């Protein structure tokens, strides 16, 4: 993987290369199958990274490698279902979409419509303010009705931070593989 962050260990200090890629694939498959059968999310390791052009830092939640693999598996199942229902001109955190496509759409509308509105916004602390209950309800109404999948997502959302004695009540953890998809599912109703 070209993403160097993918090698960052979670609270269990396991890495993708040493603890998963160098093991027999049968062991890895068995481990992930067990994770789905008896899913208990581990606490998340907190890491702060610089925000480009700003003095402040952005908190990232680093799940364990096992939890990241489970998140990726769930994302693979959910993404086509959710993508089929998202607004076609929403471009943030979407596969096969980028800012160039958003700008092309703006240019097209500006030259073909007599009247148009452009709304620019930045949802401050978007991930931090997503209500878990509303998100899970939204997923259910979109068609994600498998109880086990919803329970695993709920556990991922509520994963606490190592060294903190609290349960996460709002937002998917920033840094989670599935977090951008869940944020889009939440925001799509707006």
What are these regions (language model features)?
Residues 1-5, 76-89:
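Charged boundary/loop elements
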Residues 20-41:
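Amphipathic alpha-helical blocks
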Residues 11, 76, 121-123:
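Residues immediately flanking
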Residues 28, 43, 47, 85-89, ...:
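Conserved polymerase palm-domain catalytic core
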Residues 37, 48-51:
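Non-catalytic beta-strand/loop surface segments
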Residues 51-77, 84:
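Hydrophobic alpha-helical hairpins/lids featuring a short glycine-rich hinge
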Residues 20, 53, 64-66, 95-97, ...:
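Short, flexible loop/turn elements at secondary-structure junctions
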């Amino acid at each position: 993987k070209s993403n160097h962050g993918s090698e960052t260990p979670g609270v269990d200090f396991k890495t993708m290369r040493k603890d998963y890629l160098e093991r027999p694939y049968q062991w890895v498959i068995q481990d992930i199958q067990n994770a789905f059968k008896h899913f208990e999310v581990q606490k998340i390791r907190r890491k702060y990274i610089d925000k480009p052009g700003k003095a402040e830092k952005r908190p990232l939640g680093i799940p364990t490698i096992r939890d990241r693999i489970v998140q990726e598996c769930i994302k693979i199942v959910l993404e086509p279902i959710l993508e089929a229902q998202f607004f076609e001109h929403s471009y943030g955190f979407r596969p096969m979409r980028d800012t160039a496509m958003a700008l092309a759409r703006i240019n097209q509308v500006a030259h073909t419509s007599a009247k148009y509105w452009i709304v620019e916004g930045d949802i401050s602390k978007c991930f931090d303010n997503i209500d878990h209950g509303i998100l899970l309800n939204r997923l259910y109404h979109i068609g994600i009705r498998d109880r086990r999948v919803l329970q695993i997502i709920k556990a991922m959302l509520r994963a606490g931070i190592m060294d903190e004695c609290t349960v996460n009540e709002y937002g998917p953890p920033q840094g989670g593989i599935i977090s951008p998809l869940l944020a889009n599912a939440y925001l799509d109703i707006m």
